[in-house]
């Protein structure tokens, strides 16, 4: 099982690396073609796409959990297919509702929230309404992708995600070079959602066609809706806490200043979203093995160490060389205000990567209600941190608030998983200790050391992580994953 999950995770990571590479190439071109202000608006549109987890009311994730657990229990594929296609129909219907809502709210967002006027306001309004038209297609696509993940078709997903990533960024870049109008650039981004839907529904129909005469049971539909209902709370609050800071900043600062926050955030989030991508492979496996604690322990132990040895060296190197990398990638004037933002965000992104483990564990066991309640608890705390942080430290304060909120989220998730999963307590406690050591090393190297000593210790930590990663790969290939413990 661990070997299969590792292979699925590698396919996911490969697809994500292609997407990251395309984004790294596309953003400087968009900055040159559109300017900082319009690029800031484009990143806000990307933030709205990040709210797709809200729009689908948690049903795509519910499909992943339901499909994997049902097939693991030997349920009929015909019954599973009937449920899947019914839920995808519901998702398309929800998409029409959200289309109308965003179309109606777009003038308010442009005028009141973003405080735009003139040509910029016209372009942004056009782009937001184009984005609204794509929502039904996007939601149907997320349902199909969630089902394919439940079927553990990660190789198929990754192979198709690679060319689709080229289209997702390539089409907006092409439009920006021809016509530097951010409205049309966002419309190009929206058009790619239609292509995504056609692709994923075609693949799903090939693997899980609906059989005539077979209908979804009320019990299965009720379970999916209940799971998705609680998950929709997390999917509302989760993206809100990830992306609300940029909209709050947009209400206080001009778009060019917001870009100093959103560009490093989006880039760092994509660069370190590989663990989250890997967790997409872990989630259906945990749902399938929920009745076998020893198998879950092995999977989580492997995933815990993988997060530390793969993510820590990345965030550490980027933080140490943040100013140089931003200057080379964009320009020196942009690197100045963006560097402290990026460094603070990186430690938060590391903790967020580690928090996906208990999050996936709780949801694989059907406890989406607990993750939702934790997010409800965190939301007012984050709101206070954001307002106070921005008041005292400006854009850098937003990065500090986000990182502190992520640290709280990780602590609450690990404690909740430890409290509920008695057979996994020792493994979870060891994992938390490992995370504390990793965070201490990051803070020491980035903020306490300078010059040659900083570079030497960075090199030592990167080398140690590489050695540990190679050892993990060797053990996994040999099938001796039981030896891997945090």
Language-model regions, residue ranges each:
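Hydrophobic alpha-helical transmembrane segments
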Residues: 129, 158-206, 227, 376-382, ...
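Interhelical loop/hinge segments that connect adjacent transmembrane helices in multipass membrane
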Residues: 1-5, 182-183, 200-242, 281, ...
